């Protein structure tokens, strides 16, 4: 959340525990004993270490809040309240403050006091139940989607609250639950359950409601083909020399193609296995059929399209040195999308500067 806000121009002061700082400082991989994981998410921020149970440090924190637009916290609900720093404690002192809380289960409900990590909410939110293949053990999504979606929704909430404050002059409290965010992104799966009482199952790469829309074997690997409507299916049949299938009643509509997708996939893969993925991608792209290879991380990062979009940026840490990280996908016409981003702070690196500015 705060990385996105920093990329969009916000000044971000990261308040960390004096006892080792943010947990992610200890997560690998490491560059000269510094976490590349932490550094990639905290470029361009400032760091101050405060023990919020300590009266002097708490006073510093309140002085910072006096000149702050937004407070973002992700403690277990009730933690900051114990220290006299909850929303109800602060809203009268700082009436313009936007106070954003992101937690595992939110500030209300029977589970509100429980701790959570990304994988816990992936499991409880239903996402893992539709990920992977049938008859395999539960599969985690390959990235921390529970953390990421909560960060994105919190960022949207903060920007909405800032806009509202322009009209009302008042701050507000934002409550985002990681579990809620998993429910919010279930799209087709939750629509199927709520409308038809069907419990969706994992389907590998196949889309449950659009066909053909999955990964197919080629001569050397796999290709993603996403023929999302009848016109695209017609183009695909022509490109694959499948004119008989175009007129086959089993494949006349999207609903019928979904019903008979196993049969259609066998036919398509017989055609696709004569060429490699690169050749098929070039051929189908000429026909404007949505398709693409399945890249590993190296291939994805080295993709000229990614480089052209400044999606791999440069930053710096005084011990680790220069290193690269993922960039900002939000491109705005009024702001430069620089390849060079702000430095990564050591724990408590900016203490003197921050205290001088906010406490003098």
Question: Where in the sequence are the language-model features?
Answer:
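Glycine-rich beta-alpha junction loops
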Residues: 19, 105-106, 178-183, 220, ...
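Short Gly/Pro-enriched turn/cap motifs at secondary-structure boundaries
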Residues: 38, 203-208, 213-214, 320-323, ...
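Oxidoreductase and adenylate-handling cofactor-binding alpha/beta cores
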Residues: 151-171, 184-195, 237-244
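Aromatic-enriched alpha-helical interface/lid elements that frame and gate functional surfaces
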Residues: 211-287, 291
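Flexible, small-/acidic-enriched active-site or ligand-binding loops
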Residues: 316-360
